[in-house]
Amino acid sequence: MLKKDFWYDLPKELIAQEPADPRDAARLMVLDRKNDKILHSVFHELPHYLEKGDLLVVNNSKVLPARLMGTKVPTGAVCELLLLRQVKGDTWECLARPGKRMQPGTKVEFGDGSLTAVVDETLPDGNKHVTFTYDTETLYEKLDEFGKMPLPPYITKQLEDQSQYQTVYAKELGSAAAPTAGLHFTPQLMDTIRSRGVNIAEVTLHVGLGTFRPVNEEDIEDHQMHSEWYSVSEETAKLINETRAAGHRVIAVGTTSCRTLEAVWDRYGKIVPCSGNTSIFIYPGIELHAIDGLITNFHLPESTLIMLIAAFYGYDKTMAAYKTAVEQKYRFFSFGDAMFIR
C-alpha cells in the first residue's frame, strides 16, 4: 500500500490543545467489528462496553520531563537538549539544538548550574551522546527540577500542570512521549471497571520520539520503524494467557500496549514474560494475534499508528471511521478523543 492511501483532511481546529477535564469526559467512538456499527459515547461510559472477564492491558511507562533549556559554557549561548534514551549510567542519547554548534567537548549548564552536561560524540543521524553531572542522588531529580514535558509539535499551548501529560498509572520512567490512550482513565473509572469483573494488567513500552517521525517512503513496506524497549512481567503474561484460555477478550489500551503484545507473539508465538527491544511495524496485511480489542486515540494522517488501526479494523472501515470523526467534530491526536474497536 502507499503512504497517500492513509491521508485524510483534518481541520486545524480539531487538533486538541489540552486534555478533557475531567479526563474521562473525552468522547468515545465505539466500533463493532462484527456488525460495522458506530456508536458515539463518552469515555466514562467505557465500562458499559466491557464484559466480565475482559482484560485491559495498559502501558505503565512514565514520561520524562526530558526537555532541558540551557546555556553553553563559557559563551552563554542558549541551547536545548531532549533526552531520548539512556545509553549507560549518566550518558544519554539526546537531540540537540542547535545541533551543528554542539560539537564533542561542548559544556552546557542548566538552571542554577547544579546540572551540567558535556557532549561526548555526534552520531550518524545527528543525535548526540551526552554525559550529565549533578548534585543530587539521581538525574531524574534534576529533570523534575529543570526539565519540561516534550510535547508533540502539534500542541502549541503550554500545560498548566505537567501531570496532564501522564497517565494516572504511570510508574516506569523512560518515555519521550505519553501513551496517550491511557490519558482518559481516572482512578475512579478504573475502580468502576474492576468492580464489573474486568481485570487490568500492565506492560511497559518506553515511547520514543520516533512515534512522531513521518513515513517518508511512498511504499509503506519500505518504512523502517524506530526501536523501543518493552517489558512484560510474569504476572501480566499469566493474566493474558488465563484470559484467552477462558474465552475472554484481551483489550490493548493504546497502540504501544498493542505493539508490545504483538512483538512478544511475533517472537515467541505466545505471550511469555520477557523484555527487549522491538521495531515491529503493523500495517494492513499483517495479522494481529495477541489482542481482541483496542482502545486508542485518533492519529495523524499517513502515520504508522493509523496504519496499525487499519491492520486491526480493516482499511476501508478505518478511513470511514476517521471521516465520520471529522464530520462529528471529534478532537484529534494526543489530547483528543478516543475510539474503542471491539
Language model feature labels by segment:
Residues M1-R342:
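Surface-exposed, charge/polar-rich loops and edge strands
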